[in-house]
Amino acid sequence: EGEVLFQSERAELYREYFEKLRESARVYPCFCSRAALHAAEAPHLSDGSVVYSGTCRYLSAEEVAEREKRRSPAWRIQVPAEESAEIRYSDGLLGECLQNLARECGDFVLRRADGVFAYQLAVVVDDALSGVTEIVRGEDLRSSAARQVWLYRMLGFETPVFYHIPLLTDAD
């Protein structure tokens, strides 16, 4: 019910919330390509993704300026240190869930190098501003829930209740 929203038309709104996160000094430019990350980083998770090690996290202003001459950066948000990176949330079907952002995903992208805002930021902003209180989705998206819960909290939004349902994999 209501207006249909297109993420492709909401870049200015996402930029506003991206800037709020940048003001927290947790957002930084990252010049690592996906190919370089997959080739150099370990461990790879079971879904093929990589835990980002923070390669670009502490670049100096001079290093950033030099690298910007060669390529546009993506922008990542620094997750809490290992000891405070545990995100707990309630899943209406699975009960209490726990994920350590530092260990299981690392700093993650908020805005890609081409300027497009990442799904993690866009979905949190859209759902929060639309008044979404319950999210029902497949088990395959459970690994992104903790990142989203953390972004809800960082932006001062109420966290919805998640329901991750099993996927149908065959006719039986």
Protein language model annotation of sequence segments:
Residues R34-D172:
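Active-site cores that bind ATP or allylic diphosphates and position pyrophosphate for catalysis
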